[in-house]
């Protein structure tokens, strides 16, 4: 079992968004998944029961920013940052997502931020980062979330260059469980990639960053995500649904095993062309069962894509690449992870990059901007 301690060095990856993304309706919807309602209820109940049993972070009925000591920045984005924070009373550590309201509005991300909060507050699953509470002040929005000390999977993948077949299968199996749960709630994730997959202190997956997640009753037509991981139906603007998550899983499995995504280019336009041309090539060393699954996940016809047909997620679970996976053991975290992050103390940030601290707080916002988050 490999043990790692490193700083993540992720280069910025362009996220693509149509202007209409910011104008999407904020109403909550659900859609009929391929699983029956009884099956969905069983998935949800089992996942939430497991999440509650395994939760180690003390929770409060309410939070106040004054209760938190803000320690250090552990992540930075276009319109916000993530800080490590410590509860002054319990000593528990949290990830504090800090968003500058003016920048959110200027970047036309208002609806995405609302979506992320609404979606995360619904989710209770061992492979999804937990959100505990939200706060705001005159210029910022705050999301108090679970601190995942292992850092990004991206860091470990780049350090290793690629993962073995068994390592890729381990992570893919945990992601399948998370996607099954998310889809059962009528939610599409839309941003699956190594940078959004964190490792817990034990080495298990934690899906993070739900800014592009959306509750969906049928299809949506906006282009949201990262170029390398976009499904062809997203590029064609013919409407997409949960099938984009299964496509992204195929890209992820390929990238884990090869070290780079299957459709590449020097520019975003070239990447799009490669996706549309769909020239899928595998190294000779690529596991045959994994190859078969990736091909079925990267099926251009979304109606024939594995995970999107009558049996839904069960078709993915029943694939021969996963034949040795005990799904109950996977969900209950009884399978030993291939990578265990090196951590020396609670609140250790050694698996994150170093960032310059923000001393300005960013631009001031107007009352009109604040009104967009009146219910925050």
Task: Please provide the spans of the model-predicted regions.
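Intrinsically disordered, low-complexity regulatory segments that flank or precede the catalytic domain
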Residues: 1-62
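Protein kinase glycine-rich loop
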Residues: 70-82
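Conserved N-lobe beta3->alphaC-helix segment of eukaryotic protein kinase catalytic domains
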Residues: 93, 98-124
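Activation-segment/catalytic-loop signature of the eukaryotic protein kinase fold
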Residues: 134
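Conserved short submotifs of the Hanks-type protein kinase catalytic core
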Residues: 139-152, 156
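Activation segment signature within eukaryotic-like protein kinase domains
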Residues: 171-172
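C-terminal regulatory tails of eukaryotic serine/threonine kinases
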Residues: 303-376
């Amino acid at each position: 079992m490999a043990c790692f301690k490193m700083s993540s060095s992720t280069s910025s990856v362009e996220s693509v968004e149509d202007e209409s993304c910011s104008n999407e309706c904020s109403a909550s919807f659900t859609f009929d998944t391929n699983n029956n309602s009884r099956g969905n209820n069983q998935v949800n109940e089992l996942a939430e029961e497991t999440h509650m049993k395994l939760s180690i972070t003390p929770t409060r009925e309410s939070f106040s920013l004054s209760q938190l000591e803000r320690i250090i920045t552990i992540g930075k984005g276009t319109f916000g940052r993530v800080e490590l924070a410590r509860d002054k009373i319990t000593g528990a550590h949290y990830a504090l997502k800090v968003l500058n309201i003016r920048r959110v509005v200027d970047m036309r991300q208002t609806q995405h931020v609302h979506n992320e909060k609404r979606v995360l507050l619904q989710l209770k699953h061992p492979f999804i980062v937990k959100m505990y509470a939200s706060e705001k002040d005159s210029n910022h929005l705050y999301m108090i979330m679970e601190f995942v000390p292992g850092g990004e999977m991206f860091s470990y993948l780049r350090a290793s260059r690629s993962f073995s077949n068994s390592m890729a299968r381990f992570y893919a199996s945990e992601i399948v469980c998370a996607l099954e749960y998310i889809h059962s709630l009528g939610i599409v994730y839309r941003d699956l990639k190594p940078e959004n997959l964190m490792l817990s202190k034990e080495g298990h997956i934690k899906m993070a960053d739900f800014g592009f997640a959306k509750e969906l009753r049928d299809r949506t037509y906006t282009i949201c995500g990262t170029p390398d991981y976009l499904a062809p139906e997203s590029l064609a603007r013919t409407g997409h649904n949960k099938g984009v998550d299964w496509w992204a899983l195929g890209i992820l499995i390929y990238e884990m095993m090869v070290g780079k995504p299957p459709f590449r280019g020097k520019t975003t336009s070239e990447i799009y062309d490669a996706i549309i041309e769909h020239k899928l090539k595998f190294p000779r060393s690529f596991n045959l069962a994994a190859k078969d699954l990736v091909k079925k996940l990267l099926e251009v016809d979304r109606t024939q894509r594995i995970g999107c047909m009558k049996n839904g997620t069960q078709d993915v679970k029943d694939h021969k690449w996963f034949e040795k996976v005990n799904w109950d053991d996977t969900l209950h975290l009884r399978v030993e992870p291939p990578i265990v992050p090196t951590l020396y103390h609670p609140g250790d940030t050694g698996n994150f990059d170093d960032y310059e601290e923000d001393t300005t707080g960013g631009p001031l916002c107007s009352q009109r901007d604040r009104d967009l988050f009146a219910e925050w």
